[in-house]
Amino acid sequence: MADTHLTAPTRIIEVEGDRFAYRRWGNSGSGQPPLFFLQHFRGGMDHWDPLMTDGLAAGREVILYDYRGCASSTGVPRTLIEDMADDAAKVIRALGLSRVDVVGF
């Protein structure tokens, strides 16, 4: 059985001494870069609608993550958009990805 938003395991990746929680599932063989989701300020992975993320995961790989210091990630929460963007880029690189399409609101 394929993973879904609710069944994909929450994994941890360490970046600069802090632990970032993320979930990754979906169609990794689509030939397209993964969709990397950025949640609203201090929101967590579970704030996304599973109907939407699972619908998108049918055609693309989906990656959700918790910002530094939010939900299941450790560290001090960032207060500047620039710092949050830097963290997202570092997590993307730590996951071994050179390209993603970003989804956010």
Regions found by a protein language model. Give the residues of each.
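Alpha-helical elements of Rossmann-like donor-binding domains used by nucleotide-donor carbohydrate transfer enzymes
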Residues: A8, H47, L51, D83-K90
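Soluble or luminal CAZymes and related metallo-dependent hydrolases
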Residues: H5, E14, G44, L80-M84
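Conserved HGGG/HGGXW glycine-rich cap/lid loop of the alpha/beta-hydrolase fold
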Residues: D18-T74
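Structural motif
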Residues: H5, N27, D54-G55, I92-L95
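Short loop/turn positions at the edges of beta-strands in beta-sheet-rich folds
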Residues: E14-E16, G29, G96
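Small/polar loops that bind or transfer phosphate-bearing groups
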Residues: E14, H40, G104
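N-terminal cap/lid segment of alpha/beta-hydrolase-fold proteins
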Residues: A2-R19
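Active-site loop/oxyanion-hole signature of alpha/beta-hydrolase fold enzymes
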Residues: I63-V103
